[in-house]
Amino acid sequence: MSISEGEDQPGASSNRTARRAIDRSIASLAIPALGALVAEPLFLIVDSALIGHLGAEPLAGLAIASTILQTAVGLMIFLAYATTPLVARRRGAGDLRGAVQAGIDGLWLALGLGAVLGVALWAVSTPLVGFFGTDAGVASQAVTYLAVSCAGLPAMLVVFAATGLLRGLQDTRTPLFIATLGFAANALLNWWFIYGLGWGIAGSAWGTVAAQWAMVVVYLVVVTVHARRHGASLLPHRDGLSSAGRSGGWLFVRTIGLRAALMLTVAAAASHGTVATAGYQVVFTIFSTAAFALDALAIAAQALVGDALGARHAERARQVLRRTVFWGLACGAAIGLVLAATSPILGRVFSSDPEVLTVLPPSLLVLGLSLPLGGFVFVLDGVLMGAGDARYLAWTSLVNLAVYLPVLWAVTVLVPTGTIALVALTAAFTVVFMAARALTLGLRARGERWVTLGV
């Protein structure tokens, strides 16, 4: 054995040990986070299943109302993403009191925004539903569900912020537990209110609102325990609210850019007719499902990177970057291979329409082949969020949108309707748009400007 070989072995062993430790940390955060992410859409699935037995009008009303609600709530997801790095940095710096306080400030911000959003949405619920141009019966059902659901908006946003607090403390198991309880309560209350009390679609909305506020109560108990343990105040601090507001504002801009890309892609699909729109809905549903696994890795990256930078361990933050990118690519490739292999038959799960089934397989193949790129993007997004690089994420989301728009215009205007249209739409979003995001995120991650140490 040479001297150099003898010297390299301890270093190699140390690197392997570090990688394994980071991998264990990633798994301990990502796996429960995945469970909590999967639980969230189950609320709507339960509502759909129960309301569907009331007839076509209530189900159509739910479709419209839930679209409005999901759009409004989706724009507020920054409350979780902004709170996590603020808490994680302070935890990494050893300031657990400050970490919990930052999370509590986020809760108050969420409550205030939720109250304003709830009142505003309630006030315009009728004209918003009217925008969809449905008949009077469906519109009435939609307005009923939407108006009642507005009472739960503050609770939904508080849950976002509380989840972000616990993620920052590297606790993803408690959110999974609370989400599971909330799902069970939602199912039972909805059944009772809809069928036991005969409240119809309003009963479904009230059941969900009650479950959401019950989740808030449980979260507040958990947060109070943390506050008392570490000496944090349950009242908001002005500086903390300002900090959360600044970070959240930039992440809100980022979310606007992403939502605009999604909505414009749907509009492009609609321009190619019913078959393309239905096919795109199937493709996007599968993409969203695959994204749960990739988003769970991004959540782990947020918490671990924020903690490492708060502790002034730049190399550990880079190690987290490397390992989460590895797992993002690996998970994307694994899911993509399964999707590509099943692309000829997977569409039958979602549709029995012969035309839709004809256009789906090539598009699902494109989606499967693009998922490693998606894994790369999701993870780097989480890394830069954890680093608190919100301003960069905001501006580049607008740049990415600007790059995407001409491509989407070309797909809308120049591509003929049919199978090629759906393939082009799928490639535009999952390849072109994701490649633009990969470039802007990758360039940032290769540099050092995101590595800001301390609190």
Question: Where are the model-predicted features located?
Answer:
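Membrane-helix interface/capping residues of multi-pass secondary transporters
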Residues: S48, A56-L59, L96, T172, ...
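Hydrophobic/small/kink-forming positions within alpha-helical transmembrane segments
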Residues: F78, F183-A184, W213, A296, ...
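Transmembrane helix-bundle signature of multi-pass secondary active exporters and lipid flippases
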Residues: A33-P85, S149-M156, S242-D307, G328-I335, ...
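Small-residue-enriched core segments of transmembrane alpha-helices in multipass membrane transport
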Residues: A179-N186, T285-I286, L398-V407
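Small-residue-rich hydrophobic transmembrane alpha-helices
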Residues: L59-V119, V159-P175, G279-S343, F376-G388, ...
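Hydrophobic alpha-helical membrane segments of integral membrane proteins
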Residues: T174-I178, G203-G207, W395-T396
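Alpha-helical transmembrane segments of multipass membrane proteins
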Residues: I45-A49, P127, A161-L165, A187-W192, ...
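Short alpha-helical transmembrane segments in multi-pass integral membrane proteins
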Residues: M1-A33, V87-P154, A185-L189, I194-G249, ...
